[in-house]
Amino acid sequence: MSDALVWQVIRNNSAFLRTQRGIGKRFSTEKFNLKKVNSPKYSGLANKHAIDVSAAAKGVVVSTKNEKGRPAKAVTTSTLSKTPVASVRRLAKNAGFNKFNKLAQRRAAAIVRSQVKKAKVQKTDA
């Protein structure tokens, strides 16, 4: 099936669609949707090639979706623990996801920032 036909089917009827009060946009919780916005450009279900960046225990998990004959082999997953932002850049470039390269890097950087432990400030009695 073509990407356009899949989008026409799922754009209003999907289990991943969410709405928020006071916001006119519809959001999506699909796995390969980097912006989490319900649009054909960012849809993980409607695109044959997609990239997903999510948090792991330590580091970042990057999943890429490619068009393969078997659905079990269509998704490749790798965990990045050292320099995740540079690794995401390299993975996105090698996999051919140039239009989502910067977006994937930003998401990986935000995940890494959230995982850094903040130093505790000790109170001294004066």
Curated annotation (Swiss-Prot):
Keywords: Acetylation, Ribonucleoprotein, Ribosomal protein. GO terms for biological process: translation. GO terms for cellular component: cytosolic large ribosomal subunit. One of its GO terms (molecular function) is structural constituent of ribosome. Gene3D superfamilies: 3.30.390.110. The keyword Metal-binding does not apply. InterPro entries: Ribosomal_eL28 (IPR002672), Ribosomal_eL28/Mak16 (IPR029004). The modification N-acetylserine is found at S2. The keyword Ribosomal protein applies. It holds the Pfam family Ribosomal_L28e. Belongs to the eukaryotic ribosomal protein eL28 family. PANTHER family: 60S RIBOSOMAL PROTEIN L28. This is Large ribosomal subunit protein eL28. The gene is rpl-28.
